Design a protein with these regions (language model features):
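Bacterial carbohydrate/catabolite-sensing allosteric modules
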Residues: 1-333, 340-345, 352
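GAF sensory domains
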Residues: 354-425
């Protein structure tokens, strides 16, 4: 806690990834409404390879100041190094802080697990096609053979058909391996059948459903008038597919509210279960015919895509310009002058004492990644050179005394050179 505000530490990777952002933003807003503040600790890679560079990146998590942090959340779906997750868990448990593991794919030594239940929503989807659209002839495109998620959804699909007395011909089953090219091969087989297509094609994920819609469109087969197509996941790409898919998705606004309530309970010292489950939601839409196609929605989607492409192009241009200017520059003062055009004025660049003198020996993830005292540079608007100051590395959060007063997500990100870590916050 700082100045009366409770503080949650969010441990993630690749915040530049839209899926990660979509998980963080609703929770952050929900916690703000409950008078919390958040610190985001992010790595630019998912740490899967666990290389020396990855370990340098992971040093960012050793900056967590547990004297001010009340609760820790670890997004294990994007942090893919078990050892690093266990290190965060150990540090938090040492300070008796509650830890939430968001969507864990394996068992860890502690923490409160937050999982998602897909089964009910997918069951409702298949029942919806039978009970509301009176489908009696189905095709199903699954993911990988042996994949647990795919096999569970396939089992649910078959169970619902059996419960409703709907026969299923195995010739209408195939593995699309969760992506486009294998799905195309399955669809070519379906389209070659002399009987013609069934009434509905149930896909185990949205990516395969989008591919199916594209192939049917190319053949002049209308969705949903001629064939119903459904997906599962609610991926970002689905927002730009027309017709919009009937699918199952996570309602992340509700999830943010659900999780923030659990965080408050854990922080209050309530006895918590080892695992909590949040359900997926059935979203009936255009590809089954429950919602009408809208040209207005198409126009909005096209404009959104253009804006995203334009923002991406501007970002690429800025990064290229910065790298071109910095590549062969060795004068520290000139480096600082260049950086001020590319770094926000509310950003600090922090590094170990002696960094510019090459004195980094021993400061790695396994030892002490940060010196007792660090140097920070802040790039104020209108100044050619940054303002420099020094402070103790163990008090980063307390140094930012304006943190609780501002409804801003304070982010700590590594700038890693080889296995040594600088920090941008």
């Amino acid at each position: 806690m700082i100045n009366g505000y409770k503080v949650a530490a969010l441990c993630v990777s690749e915040i530049q990834n839209e899926n990660t952002q979509s998980m963080i933003a609703p929770l952050y807003q929900s916690l703000l409404e409950k008078n919390w503040r958040c610190l985001l600790f992010n790595t630019t890679t998912d740490l899967f390879r666990d290389t020396a560079f990855d370990r340098g990146e992971a040093s960012i998590f050793q900056l967590m100041d547990f004297s001010v942090i009340d609760v820790v959340l670890i997004y294990t779906q994007c942090l893919k190094c078990r050892a690093i997750v266990e290190d965060i868990l150990t540090a938090a448990q040492k300070h008796r802080k509650p830890v939430f593991l968001i969507e864990p794919t394996e068992r860890y030594s502690g923490g409160i697990r937050i999982s998602f239940d897909e089964a009910d929503a997918f069951r409702y989807l298949v029942k919806h096609l039978i009970e509301q659209h009176h489908v009696t002839k189905f095709a199903c495109i699954a993911g990988f053979k042996g994949n647990p998620a795919s096999e569970i959804r396939e089992m649910i699909f078959r169970d619902v058909l059996k419960e409703h007395g709907v026969p299923f011909d195995e010739k209408w089953f195939g593995y699309g391996n969760f992506y486009s090219i294998p799905t195309q091969e399955v669809m070519e087989r379906f389209l070659a059948d002399p009987e013609g297509l069934p009434q509905a094609i149930v896909c185990i994920n949205d990516s395969m459903a989008i591919t199916v819609c594209e192939i049917l469109e190319e053949r002049g087969i209308r969705v949903p008038e001629d064939v119903i197509v459904t997906g599962f996941d609610g991926i970002v790409q689905e927002q730009y597919n027309f017709p919009r898919l009937t699918t199952c998705r996570r309602n992340l606004d509700r999830f943010g509210s659900f999780l923030s309530k659990l965080i408050e309970r854990a922080n209050a010292g309530e006895e918590m279960k080892r695992e909590y489950v949040f359900p997926y939601t059935l979203d009936v839409s255009e590809s089954c015919g429950c919602r009408k196609f809208s040209m207005k929605a198409v126009g909005l989607a096209v404009n959104s895509i253009y804006s995203r492409m334009n923002n991406s192009a501007q970002y690429d241009r800025s990064m290229t310009n910065m790298l071109t200017k910095l590549t062969f520059e060795q004068d520290v003062e000139k480096v600082n002058e260049i950086l001020r055009y590319y770094i926000r004025s509310d950003t600090y660049l922090c590094m170990n004492a002696g960094f510019f003198h090459g004195d980094q020996n021993g400061h790695t993830y396994e030892t002490e990644p940060f010196t007792e005292e660090v140097t920070s540079l802040r790039f104020f608007t209108g100044r050619k050179t940054p303002k420099s100051r020094r402070f103790r590395s163990g008090s980063w959060c307390r140094t930012g005394t304006t943190l609780p007063k501002e409804q801003t997500l304070w982010s700590f990100m590594p700038c890693t050179i080889s296995r040594w870590c600088m920090v941008i916050w």
